[in-house]
């Protein structure tokens, strides 16, 4: 009857087309081979298989695995497992096979819907009711895996965790009468619950994303150890039962009958013989079965041996290659050490120089402060300031005096203009008055002539009439005429006096014109007329001209100044942006500090979780004690259990004490961490202080530069003012000379004109003489006529009077005597009056004629003078108009600009007010004159009214005379006008030509002057610019040199301090490692747990770091101890197998004795092993060592960060120094230019006094040019100063940036070099430590050897540590691995939990077959050829579903090998890990617990090919900086994590060993395979084409993931796990030996540096 293997359970998931058919065929062949085996072979294999069973029927396996699991994670708080305890019979009893075998399947079913940890421990384990399951781990469906050696079956779920120890898959059904081979020992029967347990189960639907198809199952034979134990327990009972039957038959027979007695005896003997025969037959059959089984095992072992020989040859070749590589690396290391030494010396020199520069700077600053404080400098400054203030005051006073002079001159000019205007108005008024007087005189003459005629007519009429009344009327008229004559005479006198005054003024005017005052005043009038018309002064004109010249010549300068201002604004914005960036950097640093604080809190939380796990382990220990008390074997072996319990309790107390010590260490570590934070904060404060000091120095330097530039500006300004003033004075003199020459020419021309005028005057005098002669003739003739008329009138009057007297006498004589007397009196009176009237009339007529002649002469003279004046005025007006036109054309722009000036408007208002006042005065005067004239006219008219009658006659006479005079005057005036017109036309032509010539000459001269002035200004400005640029360059160079020297000194000092501090830290760490190694060595030699020492010396290291260092070292030593024990147990079991086989063939009857001896030997062995295994401290110390390493890495990362920051600051300082040097050069150049300008000033100041006394007319013209040039120079100087300021600011900003970059690069370089050296030394030491020379020596020797190797490792670690090339690929591609982070964070917990499982029952060593190895090699070759053609979807599906290594990938992640989750071709490479080696599990896994998180990010989960289709070469072009928040371990890969080709070796070698040496063989194979892997991993990996691996390392690094991993890496598991449990749990997943072709492919690949200096340098070329 054959066992029914469920074919459905053996099928694998075939959801993709990429399933390997060859692997499936091999699976089918293996299935057929197992089903065809006979029952006896299966029985033998069940009892004799050394492999641990994965089936649920193996209650013994469960009972032994679970306590080991618990012991791994909580070695300090849990009891030792039961299978390790020595019993009296020498066997290890199974305490749980009867108790919970039936419940296991039910429990596994209940685990599906619960929360799962990464290692399968149920979160809700505290709520479990059954006490049988409180002490073991629970596993969900995810942990049930197929145990076939090809490893094709896997789960496609996303929440895959590490495999458990007990399979929850559907199991095969054992027959009811099945009994294993017992070797004549009693076999324990399975209880009825076994049948229920053997039933397969379907996975519940509650588990998300998990396939519900049946699981694949491999036949797992029953373990020999269980069989032996059951035989020991059950054989005595079976024997006792048989003898009781015989005794009963014997006693029941009749005692009387002898025949019956004999028959019965014979029957008994026969039965006894039959039983003996049966027993012999059974033994024979059993021996045959055993022989068959051993033959079968021998064949398997031979095949394994062939494979091992091949692998040994390959490993030897790889070892040789690795040794060559090691020699090369040593050479490189020595070279690097030399470079490091040279760099350290350079750093020391730089620091010394930096210190010197700092001291010099401080001394200079102190000297500057002292100089500032010193009284002499203050006095000099005060004197300088006083001198400057005095000069400014003098300058201002001079300016004010000049302005006052100008104002006075302008006022004088205005007054003269007013006088001229008044004189002109007076002349006009006088002319008008003269015209009016002429008109009045003509009217009077006309009237007089008329009155004469009328009087003559009246006289004639009177003479004719001769009446007395007429005579009286005539007398009255005569009286009136006489009175009017008197009035006219007075008016004539007044008019003559006014005419004299005007003549005197005209003579004065003519004399002034002859002397040249008129020309000068006319020249002044040229300016004054235009100014009067515009209402402005010469000062404003000068300013306006200055502004115009600035506007014309300084356009480019203004534009350049605006551009400079814009540049200044942009530079100011850049400085503000740098400050903002620095502030942002400070904020980032604060955020990082907060992140580190959060990390510390998370570490504290992890400590709390560890304490919780310790409590859980205590609870589990109590549960174990309860289980032991309640177990069915307690009654039989209570004494042993009590002893074991006492031992466990004692160990528990010791572990509790150690735990308390560790807590103290943790507290000390926290204190050290706080100290480190404080030191970091102090460093940050120092950095801030340095930055503030630098900013303050920068500000002081800028202020100093500003002061120097201001002083320089003032000096240059004064110098330029003096130079320009001198130039302008000289130019003014030249212009004044030119103008004077022109004035002389004009005077000469005026003299000629005066000569002509003199000729004209002579002609006029001749005419006047002729006129006088004519007037005299006319007067004589008129006098004669008057005399004649008078004589005639007198004669007529006498006759008339005589007649009247005669008549009156006659009448009077006749009338009366009285009347005669009266009449006589009246007549006498009348005669007197008439005579008098006649005489008066004659004299009056003569006088009037004289007056008229004089008036005519005067009028002619006045007309001549007036013509001359008009000609002169017209000449002056024309010249002034021409000059004004030229001036208006030349200064048209200035006039346009001037109207907008406020001063112009104010002056206009003033001039308008003055003009209005003068007009008002003139109007008042004119009104008063008009009133006076009107009064006179009125009086004259009133007088004339009385004499109208008399004057008619005189008027007729006068009219006749006037007509004659007018005719003569008109003739003379016509002659004069004709002569004057001819002379005026000639003179106008000549003057017009001369004015045009003068105008052209003036324009030419003005243009030449402007061109020369502009050229001079441009030359001076260009020279000033050149000198200013030179000084600026010199100042900048000087400042750069000073800054460079200071930076060099500061860098040297800083490098020295940092190197000393790093050396001190390294020395302290190494001393602590040595001391810990000595203590571990003493503990191992004494075989007793010694209390941990507190740190004796006061070290700067953290207490937690020291504690972790101790823990790591102890853990490594414990791993070596376990290896040694495993080797010893394996050797002993081999010997015992051989002896037992010999004894079974020879002795049949002495079986019980041999069994007793065997049990005694086993008991003694277990007792020795129990003694040796009571020291589980080493593993805990290894864990603590790893924690300390992590702390060390964290501290190093912080130090590197600080170094980076310092390096950046140094770079900034260098940049600032360069900028300062440039500024210094610039300032020196400016100083030189300043000195040159001062020399020029001194040279030019000497002739300046002579130039300071110019002519007033010239000074007005040159002040404008002077002011214009000053404004231009000032604008250019302000531009230059602003540009220098901008350059300084920009230089400071750039220097800061350069110093920061330099600091970063230097710190990064140092950090990378030291990290690389550290990792190299550490890996080499681990490699040497993990090497096993194959000497099967005693346990103590091996322990001593391991301790000595650890001590040498600690000595080697004294060299500086760094990671130069590892950071090159850690800073990229992290956003792609978020899905993988969720897995690796769970797996990271499982990394710590399975840390202490199976030492004897190793599930790694099962189900490895040669067929599966060959299949895997073929698959690797095929997938390597097709690896680059994988698409995104295919790559993802291949990794997610059809890959044959999902559980192995998880196990590799859990074992710190999460670096290896690469894309398709590399999946085969990752399986060659030294999973069998317990030493690797102890040391290397703990070394890479921290790197597992980081390496988990190197290659994310199976979704990786979706993002990167195919494998690509990744060439790093720049050195990346390690992320501060990432993992602290930069180790790319552990020595075990890449290739572990010897994992199958251990499992296959165990198949041919006896059933009793299974546990020992597990450890021996693990040690052998690990040593081979450690010796060959560098060489083997050197040929691997894994460029893509390191490319993905560079691309998958992320801050968040690194932070998560770094936080979760230190969380201990919820329950205790042996560090080897995860290592041993991966063999069933299908480890594969590399074929020779595969190795050749690896070695042929080119080597390319990926940036990681790892033991696998050629993996970067994987394509």
Curated annotation (Swiss-Prot):
What keywords are assigned to this protein? Cilium biogenesis/degradation, Coiled coil, Cytoplasm, Cytoskeleton
Q: Where is the composition biased (Low complexity)?
A: 44-57
Bias (Polar residues) occurs at: 1603-1613
Q: Which residue intervals make up region (Disordered)?
A: 1-60, 1383-1408, 1595-1628
- The protein's organism comes out as Xenopus laevis (African clawed frog)
**Similarity remark:** Belongs to the CEP152 family.
Cite the InterPro entries for this sequence: CEP152/SHC-Transforming (IPR051235)
Instruction: Report the coiled-coil segments.
Output: 266-516, 571-664, 696-796, 843-886, 946-977, 1014-1047, 1182-1288
Give the record's GO biological process terms: cell projection organization; centriole replication; de novo centriole assembly involved in multi-ciliated epithelial cell differentiation
Q: What is this protein called?
A: Centrosomal protein of 152 kDa
- Does the record bear Cytoplasm in its keywords? yes
Tell me which GO cellular component terms the UniProt record holds: centriole; centrosome; cytoplasm; deuterosome; pericentriolar material
Indicate where this protein resides in the cell: Cytoplasm, Cytoskeleton, Microtubule organizing center, Centrosome; Cytoplasm, Cytoskeleton, Microtubule organizing center, Centrosome, Centriole
Give the protein's biological function. Necessary for centrosome duplication; the function also seems to involve cep63, cdk5rap2 and wdr62 through a stepwise assembled complex at the centrosome that recruits cdk2 required for centriole duplication. Acts as a molecular scaffold facilitating the interaction of plk4 and cpap, 2 molecules involved in centriole formation. Also plays a key role in deuterosome-mediated centriole amplification in multiciliated that can generate more than 100 centrioles. Overexpression of cep152 can drive amplification of centrioles.
């Amino acid at each position: 009857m054959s066992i029914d293997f469920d074919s459905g359970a053996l099928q694998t998931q075939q959801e993709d087309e990429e399933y390997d058919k060859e692997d499936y065929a091999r699976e089918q062949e293996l299935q057929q081979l197992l089903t065809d085996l006979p029952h006896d072979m299966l029985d033998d294999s069940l009892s004799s298989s050394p492999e641990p069973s994965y089936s649920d029927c193996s209650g013994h396996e469960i009972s032994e695995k679970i306590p080991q699991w618990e012991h791994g994670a909580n070695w300090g708080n849990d009891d030792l497992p039961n299978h390790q305890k020595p019993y009296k019979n020498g066997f290890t009893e199974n305490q749980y096979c009867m108790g919970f075998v039936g419940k296991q399947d039910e429990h596994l079913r209940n685990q599906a819907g619960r929360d799962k940890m990464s290692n399968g421990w149920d979160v809700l384990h505290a709520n479990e009711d059954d006490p049988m399951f409180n002490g073991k781990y629970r596993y969900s469906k995810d942990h049930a895996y197929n145990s076939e050696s090809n490893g094709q079956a896997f789960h496609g779920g996303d929440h895959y965790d590490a495999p458990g120890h007990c399979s929850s898959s559907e199991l095969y059904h054992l027959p009811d009468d099945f009994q294993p081979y017992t070797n004549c020992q009693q076999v324990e029967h399975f209880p009825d619950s076994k049948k229920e347990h053997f039933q397969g189960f379907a996975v519940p639907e509650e588990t998300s994303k998990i396939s519900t198809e049946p699981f694949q199952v491999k036949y797992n034979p029953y373990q020999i150890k269980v069989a032996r134990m059951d035989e020991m327990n059950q054989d005595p009972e079976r024997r006792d039962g048989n003898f009781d039957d015989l005794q009963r038959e014997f006693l029941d027979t009749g005692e009387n009958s002898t025949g019956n007695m004999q028959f019965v005896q014979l029957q008994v003997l026969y039965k006894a013989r039959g039983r003996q025969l049966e027993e012999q037959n059974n033994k024979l059959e059993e021996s045959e079965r055993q022989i068959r089984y051993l033959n079968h095992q021998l064949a398997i072992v031979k095949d394994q041996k062939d494979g091992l020989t091949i692998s040994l040859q390959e490993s030897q070749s790889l070892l040789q290659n690795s040794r060559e590589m090691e020699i090369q690396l040593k050479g490189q290391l020595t070279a690097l050490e030399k470079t490091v030494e040279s760099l350290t010396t350079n750093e020391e020199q730089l620091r010394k120089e930096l210190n010197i520069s700092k001291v010099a700077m401080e001394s200079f600053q102190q000297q500057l402060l002292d100089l500032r404080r010193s009284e002499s400098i203050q006095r000099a400054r005060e004197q300088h300031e006083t001198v400057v203030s005095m000069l400014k005051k003098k300058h201002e006073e001079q300016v004010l005096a000049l302005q006052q002079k100008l104002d006075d001159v302008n006022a004088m000019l205005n007054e003269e203009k007013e006088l001229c205007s008044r004189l002109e108005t007076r002349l006009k008024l006088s002319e008008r008055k003269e015209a009016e007087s002429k008109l009045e005189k003509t009217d009077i003459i006309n009237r007089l002539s008329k009155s004469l005629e009328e009087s003559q007519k009246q006289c004639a009429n009177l003479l004719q009439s001769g009446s007395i009344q007429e005579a009286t009327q005539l007398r009255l008229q005569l009286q009136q005429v006489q009175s009017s004559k008197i009035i006219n005479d007075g008016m004539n006198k007044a008019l003559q006096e006014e005419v004299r005054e005007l003549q005197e003024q005209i003579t004065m005017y003519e004399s002034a014109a002859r002397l040249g005052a008129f020309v000068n005043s006319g020249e002044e009038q040229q300016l004054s007329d235009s100014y009067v018309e515009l209402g402005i002064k010469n000062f404003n004109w000068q300013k306006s001209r200055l502004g115009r010249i600035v506007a014309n010549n300084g356009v480019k300068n203004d534009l350049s100044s605006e551009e400079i201002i814009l540049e200044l604004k942009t530079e100011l914005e850049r400085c503000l942006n740098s400050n903002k960036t620095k502030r942002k950097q400070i904020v980032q640093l604060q955020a990082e500090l907060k992140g580190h604080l959060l990390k510390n809190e998370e570490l504290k939380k992890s400590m709390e979780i560890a304490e919780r796990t310790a409590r859980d382990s205590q609870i589990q220990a109590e549960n174990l004690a309860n289980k032991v008390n309640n177990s069915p074997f307690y009654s039989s072996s209570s004494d042993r259990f009590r002893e074991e319990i006492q031992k466990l309790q004692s160990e528990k107390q010791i572990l509790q004490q150690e735990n308390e010590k560790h807590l103290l260490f943790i507290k000390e570590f926290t204190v050290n961490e706080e100290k480190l934070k404080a030191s970091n904060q102090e460093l940050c404060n120092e950095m801030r202080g340095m930055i503030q000091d630098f900013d303050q120095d920068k500000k002081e330097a800028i202020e100093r530069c500003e002061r120097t530039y201001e002083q320089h500006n003032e000096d240059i300004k004064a110098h330029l003012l003096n130079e320009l003033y001198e130039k302008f004075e000289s130019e003014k003199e030249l212009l004044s000379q030119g103008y004077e020459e022109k004035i002389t020419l004009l005077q000469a021309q005026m003299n000629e004109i005066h000569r002509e005028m003199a000729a004209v005057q002579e002609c006029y005098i001749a005419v006047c003489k002729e006129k006088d002669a004519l007037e005299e003739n006319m007067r004589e003739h008129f006098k004669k006529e008057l005399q004649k008329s008078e004589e005639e009138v007198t004669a007529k009057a006498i006759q008339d009077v005589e007649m009247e007297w005669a008549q009156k006498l006659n009448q009077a004589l006749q009338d009366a005597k009285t009347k005669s007397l009266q009449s006589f009196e009246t007549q006498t009176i009348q005669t007197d009056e008439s005579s008098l009237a006649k005489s008066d009339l004659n004299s009056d007529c003569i006088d009037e004629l004289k007056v008229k002649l004089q008036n005519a002469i005067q009028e002619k003279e006045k007309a001549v003078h007036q013509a001359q004046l008009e000609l002169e005025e017209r000449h002056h007006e024309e010249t002034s108009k021409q000059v004004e036109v030229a001036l208006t054309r030349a200064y048209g722009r200035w006039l346009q600009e001037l109207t907008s000036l406020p001063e112009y408007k104010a002056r206009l208002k003033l001039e308008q007010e003055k003009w209005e006042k003068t007009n008002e005065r003139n109007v008042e005067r004119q009104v008063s004159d008009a009133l006076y004239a009107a009064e006179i006219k009125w009086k004259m008219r009133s007088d004339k009214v009385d004499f109208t009658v008399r004057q008619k006659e005189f008027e007729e006479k006068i009219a006749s005379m006037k007509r004659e005079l007018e005719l003569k005057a008109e003739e003379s005036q016509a002659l004069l006008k004709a002569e004057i017109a001819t002379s005026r036309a000639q003179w106008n032509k000549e003057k017009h030509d001369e004015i045009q010539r003068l105008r052209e000459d003036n324009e030419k001269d003005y243009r030449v002057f402007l061109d020369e002035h502009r050229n001079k200004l441009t030359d001076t400005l260009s020279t000033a610019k050149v000198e200013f640029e030179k000084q600026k360059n010199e100042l900048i160079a000087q400042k750069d040199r000073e800054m460079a020297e200071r930076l060099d000194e500061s860098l040297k000092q800083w490098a020295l301090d940092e190197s000393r501090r790093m050396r001190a830290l390294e020395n302290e760490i190494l001393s602590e490692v040595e001391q810990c190694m000595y203590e571990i060595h003493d503990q191992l030699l004494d075989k007793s747990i010694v209390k941990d020492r507190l740190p004796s010396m006061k070290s700067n290291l953290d207490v937690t770091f020291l504690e972790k260092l101790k823990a790591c070292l102890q853990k490594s030593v414990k791993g070596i101890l376990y290896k040694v024990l495993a080797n010893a147990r394996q050797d002993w079991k081999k010997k015992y197998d051989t002896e037992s086989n010999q004894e079974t063939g020879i002795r049949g009857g002495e079986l019980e004795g041999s069994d007793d001896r065997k049990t005694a030997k086993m008991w003694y062995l277990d007792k020795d092993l129990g003694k040796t295994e009571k020291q589980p401290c080493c593993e805990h110390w290894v864990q603590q060592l790893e924690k300390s390493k992590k702390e060390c890495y964290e501290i190093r990362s912080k130090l590197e960060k600080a170094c980076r920051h310092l390096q950046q600051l140094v770079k900034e300082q260098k940049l600032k120094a360069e900028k300062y040097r440039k500024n210094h050069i610039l300032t020196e150049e400016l100083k030189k230019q300043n000195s040159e300008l001062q020399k020029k000033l001194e040279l030019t100041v000497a002739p300046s006094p002579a130039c300071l006394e110019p002519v007033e007319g010239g000074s007005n013209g040159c002040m404008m040019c002077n002011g214009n040039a000053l404004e231009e120079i000032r604008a250019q100087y302000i531009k230059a100063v602003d540009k220098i300021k901008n350059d300084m600011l920009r230089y400071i900003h750039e220097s800061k940036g350069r110093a920061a970059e330099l600091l970063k690069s230097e710190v990064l370089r140092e950090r990378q070099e030291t990290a690389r050296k550290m990792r190299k030394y550490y890996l080499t030491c681990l490699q040497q430590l993990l090497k096993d020379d194959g000497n099967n020596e005693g346990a103590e020797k091996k322990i001593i050897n391991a301790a000595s190797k650890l001590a040498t490792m600690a000595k080697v670690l004294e060299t500086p540590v760094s990671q130069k090339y590892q950071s090159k690929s850690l800073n990229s591609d992290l956003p792609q691995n978020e899905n993988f982070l969720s897995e690796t964070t769970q797996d990271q917990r499982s990394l710590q939990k399975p840390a202490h499982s199976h030492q004897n029952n190793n599930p790694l060593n099962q189900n490895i077959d040669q067929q599966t190895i060959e299949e895997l090699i073929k698959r690797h070759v095929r997938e390597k050829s097709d690896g680059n053609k994988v698409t995104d979807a295919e790559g993802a599906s291949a990794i997610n579903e059809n890959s044959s290594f999902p559980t192995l990938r998880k196990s590799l992640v859990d074992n710190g090998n999460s670096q290896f989750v690469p894309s398709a071709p590399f999946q085969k490479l990752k399986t060659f890990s030294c999973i069998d080696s317990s030493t690797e599990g102890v040391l290397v896994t703990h070394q890479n617990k921290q790197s597992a998180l980081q390496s988990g990010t190197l290659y994310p989960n199976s979704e990786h090919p979706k993002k990167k289709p195919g494998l690509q070469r990744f060439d790093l072009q720049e050195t990346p900086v390690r992320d501060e928040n990432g993992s602290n371990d930069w180790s790319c890969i552990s020595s075990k994590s890449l290739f572990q080709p010897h994992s199958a070796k251990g499992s296959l070698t165990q198949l041919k060993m006896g059933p009793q040496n299974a546990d020992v063989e597990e450890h021996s194979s693990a040690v052998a395979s690990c040593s081979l892997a450690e010796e060959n991993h560098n060489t083997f990996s050197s040929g691997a084409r894994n460029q893509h691996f390191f490319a993905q390392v560079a691309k998958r690094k992320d801050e968040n993931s690194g932070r998560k991993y770094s936080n979760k890496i230190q969380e201990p598991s919820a329950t205790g796990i042996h560090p080897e449990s995860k290592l041993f749990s991966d063999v069933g997943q299908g480890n594969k030996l590399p074929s020779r072709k595969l190795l050749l492919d690896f070695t042929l690949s080119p080597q390319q540096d990926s940036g990681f200096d790892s033991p696998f340098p050629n993996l970067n070329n994987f394509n």
